[in-house]
Amino acid sequence: MDNERQKALDTVIKNMEKSFGKGAVMKLGDNKGRRVSSTSSGSVTVDNALGVGGYPKGRIIEIYGPESSGKTTVALHAIAEVQKNGGVAAFIDAEHALDPVYAQALGVDIDNLYLSQPDHGEQGLEIAEAFVRSGAVDIVVVDSVAALTPKAEIEGEMGDTHVGLQARLMSQALRKLSGAISKSNTTAIFINQIREKVGVMFGNPETTPGGRALKFYSSVRLEVRRAEQLKQGQDIVGNRTKIKVVKNKVAPPFRVAEVDIMYGQGISKEGELIDLGVENDIVDKSGAWYSYNGDRMGQGKENVKNYLKENPQIKEEIDRKLREKLGIFDGDVDENENEDDSPKTLFDE
């Protein structure tokens, strides 16, 4: 570029920075050293499927699936992990159905979890926005999008038609939230339900409520589905759950994580260590027997789970080896380890 054009460009950039602040315009290469920072999902299997060691910070995540598939459980594990690393979490309970006893069993510090049970959708999203803009909250979970009922619908009569109200509400909210989420480095998780499209003869009839906006603004979309029931004798004690990454802007999509969600306990950490350990040649499996470093741990997966619960040192050793092999870090992964812990944006110098 010749000198005259460069001078003109420099003048324009100076004027922009004077009007909008330093860093309003930058060269992309100035931040080429930065990588996506993440916070652990609380499951090494899900962290591996996400490709960046967890949920990306400063991004919108959608977790959707059928009823009782484990969506809230997956989100609560993420909250527990953030709190374990000294972070602050907020939960917008639009469904008014959060069980504090179950949340505590999953490792959530309920005494330090900020909870809101809004009266209508606008209130819930405004509270979420306030948490995000504060810059002091590390993770915000909205449960669920389908329960964010517009105020006009709540105040109206039963049977009144309100076409597209919720979709417009979500579209407006996400337009306001997306920039604030990025600048505050907050992880925003929206839980969503599934609906059936009427009259679909071919293709997938399933869709998610709230319009298309959330699909577009989400950097990661996870589909959670029950694969099979887990039994001990005649008793059903949990579900084998498939978590598919159907959209991923920060790593390759379409990876699948399979985890055991046990009733009253959440994701079985021991179960995923066994599965991933066998897959990555850290745990040896011969028939129904499982071994580690030549020592037998037990026959059958349930017995090995109990063995790992009783031997936490071996459990931690397998976990450490797995994370090293898969390149996953335990806890928060920061863009720059030498930087302070204050919220960062691309515009920070």
Curated annotation (Swiss-Prot):
Organism for this UniProt entry: Staphylococcus epidermidis (strain ATCC 35984 / DSM 28319 / BCRC 17069 / CCUG 31568 / BM 3577 / RP62A)
SMART domains assigned: AAA
Protein name per Swiss-Prot or TrEMBL: Protein RecA
Role this protein plays: Can catalyze the hydrolysis of ATP in the presence of single-stranded DNA, the ATP-dependent uptake of single-stranded DNA by duplex DNA, and the ATP-dependent hybridization of homologous single-stranded DNAs. It interacts with LexA causing its activation and leading to its autocatalytic cleavage.
Compartment(s) of residence: Cytoplasm
GO biological process, one term: DNA repair
Gene: recA
This protein's record includes keyword Manganese: no
SUPFAM superfamilies in UniProt: P-loop containing nucleoside triphosphate hydrolases, RecA protein, C-terminal domain
MF term (GO), any: single-stranded DNA binding
HAMAP family per the UniProt record, alphabetical: RecA
Tagged with keyword DNA-binding: yes
PROSITE patterns: RECA_1, RECA_2, RECA_3
Any single GO CC term annotated in Swiss-Prot or TrEMBL for this entry: cytosol
Record keywords, A-Z: ATP-binding, Cytoplasm, DNA damage, DNA recombination, DNA repair, DNA-binding, Nucleotide-binding, SOS response
Residues at which ATP binds: G65, P66, E67, S68, S69, G70, K71, T72
Chain intervals with Acidic residues compositional bias: 331-340
Family as reported in the entry's similarity comment: Belongs to the RecA family.
Pfam families cross-referenced by the UniProt entry: RecA (PF00154), RecA_C (PF21096)
Renumbered residue ranges of the record's region Disordered: 329-349
Lineage: Bacteria, Bacillati, Bacillota, Bacilli, Bacillales
